[in-house]
From Swiss-Prot:
<feature type="binding site">
    <location>
        <position position="149"/>
    </location>
    <ligand>
        <name>Mn(2+) 2</name>
    </ligand>
</feature>
<dbReference type="Pfam" id="PF00491">
    <property type="entry name" value="Arginase"/>
</dbReference>
<dbReference type="InterPro" id="IPR005923">
    <property type="entry name" value="HutG"/>
</dbReference>
<dbReference type="InterPro" id="IPR006035">
    <property type="entry name" value="Ureohydrolase"/>
</dbReference>
<feature type="binding site">
    <location>
        <position position="234"/>
    </location>
    <ligand>
        <name>Mn(2+) 1</name>
    </ligand>
</feature>
<dbReference type="InterPro" id="IPR023696">
    <property type="entry name" value="Ureohydrolase_dom_sf"/>
</dbReference>
<feature type="binding site">
    <location>
        <position position="123"/>
    </location>
    <ligand>
        <name>Mn(2+) 1</name>
    </ligand>
</feature>
<dbReference type="GO" id="GO:0019557">
    <property type="term" value="P:L-histidine catabolic process to glutamate and formate"/>
</dbReference>
<feature type="binding site">
    <location>
        <position position="147"/>
    </location>
    <ligand>
        <name>Mn(2+) 2</name>
    </ligand>
</feature>
<dbReference type="GO" id="GO:0033389">
    <property type="term" value="P:putrescine biosynthetic process from arginine, via agmatine"/>
</dbReference>
<feature type="compositionally biased region" description="Polar residues">
    <location>
        <begin position="1"/>
        <end position="13"/>
    </location>
</feature>
<keyword id="KW-0464">Manganese</keyword>
<dbReference type="GO" id="GO:0050415">
    <property type="term" value="F:formimidoylglutamase activity"/>
</dbReference>
<comment type="function">
    <text>Catalyzes the conversion of N-formimidoyl-L-glutamate to L-glutamate and formamide.</text>
</comment>
<feature type="binding site">
    <location>
        <position position="234"/>
    </location>
    <ligand>
        <name>Mn(2+) 2</name>
    </ligand>
</feature>
<dbReference type="GO" id="GO:0008783">
    <property type="term" value="F:agmatinase activity"/>
</dbReference>
<feature type="binding site">
    <location>
        <position position="147"/>
    </location>
    <ligand>
        <name>Mn(2+) 1</name>
    </ligand>
</feature>
Amino acid sequence: MFQNATDWTPTSTDPRDEQFGGVVEPVPTPSDADDYDAVLVGEPYDGAVIGRRGARDGPSAIRESLAGVKTHHFDAGAVSGVADLGDVVLPDGDVADTQAAVREAAAEVHETAALPVFVGGDNSLSYANVAPLVAADNGAVGVVSVDAHLDCRAVGDRGPTSGTPYRQLFDAGLDALAVVGARHFETTTTYAGFLRDQGGRIVTSDAVAADRDGSLDAAREALDGVDHVYVSVDIDVLDAAYPGASAPTPGGIQPRELFALVEALAASDDRIRGFELVETAPTLDTGGRTVDAAARTIAHFLAGAQ
């Protein structure tokens, strides 16, 4: 079910430069992650992406970048207690087969004592990562999706895509969704109306830029009644200056805003049950800037969660 992770190696030769490459430890099975605070899981798949492909290379590139990031956070201290379960072994087949395999793997990861950190891969796998929490019937589940798009498209003849995960999750029983960083002119009236009909909250990228803390409060308010919270980041929430994504467009948020959002969510809410970062496409990037932003987003989330 999992292809074991390779050993992590720091990029610095100075032993005082404690980096994630010297802290993250590979583990062979989900049960071995119980001794850690968080566990990384790679999902190298982009067969369902609507736009440009390349996200299948995201997990390996993000790991490589994260290995060279120092673990010290000025407020939270040094990040530690992180395992790496490796990549989910994906089947040959259609998107539905892939979602089923990832869902089975994600269910095992959610049963561990460690906080799951899924590294994609395309946005279609958000359904597979969250569905086990919904199916557990152990309380209401809500998602904070930090994304330029709503991803509430109906599943059509093509089957599931990177644009359908939250429609699939609502159909499965998801209780609440807040989309933070959504961009004007990136969705349709139909899908915006669908999300609002479900009681969802849309917080635009303009709102994040004008009042980051207020935007975070709006997202929390939308999830006020749930018992479990899952946080999803689609890297295309960043401005098009960070081009290593399937669908970069102008008007996105800045990395500093993204880092602060995920760190605050992780630090202030004990209902967090998982995190994912999706749609990073290294082959579409310029100078590794998007990959580096993705790696540091994970670092900030881990700092907030500890």
